[in-house]
Amino acid sequence: MSIKNLPADYLLAAQQGDIDKVKTCLALGVDINTCDRQGKTAITLASLYQQYACVQALIDAGADINKQDHTCLNPFLISCLNDDLTLLRIILPAKPDLNCVTRFGGVGLTPACEKGHLSIVKELLAHTEINVNQTNHVGWTPLLEAIVLNDGGIKQQAIVQLLLEHGASPHLTDKYGKTPLELARERGFEEIAQLLIAAGA
């Protein structure tokens, strides 16, 4: 292992989950938060490749868990986007910045609601104070995304119910002024419509 190639060796070791090599690189003085050409740090690569023990080792060594790559990814957002509950449970005790947003301007809860990642939504709402009414670049809240960008099925109904129970507003409209109730009814999602009505929509 040459000093010249130390950053590349370190990043590859993290991606492959080679904790001993990661620790050797750190002992040789590599910057723990060095990035590849896409802006991905070692802990981001370990997160993407589900190298959970390596993620924990890097947290313990003081890695920056909030640093985002060129497409705004970081370990917390990766866990939310990829439905990776194991990763989320490693990251949350390290106190990630819950206000970090995806390239579309949504907090981690937003894509989890859109994609139907029920276990992630439950974990976030039970164990964090993440903003349930945060509005992304296209004017949608997590509630609106849960309605508009999925199939209205059982999982989405459960997500809508959880959001409403945790303070999501049934009155916040999209950028065209349409309410969650209107959008649910337009799509024929009557079960979701009834949940919204019960919440005061």
Curated annotation (Swiss-Prot):
Top-level taxonomic group: Bacteria
UniProt-listed Gene3D superfamilies: Ankyrin repeat-containing domain (1.25.40.20)
Keyword field contains Repeat: yes
Alphabetically ordered keywords of this record: ANK repeat, Repeat
ANK repeats: 5-34, 38-67, 71-100, 104-134, 138-172, 176-201
Gene Ontology process terms (BP): response to radiation
Transmembrane segments annotated in the record for this chain: none
Annotated InterPro entries: Ankyrin_rpt (IPR002110), Ankyrin_rpt-contain_sf (IPR036770)
Protein name: Putative ankyrin repeat protein YahD
Organism name: Escherichia coli (strain K12)
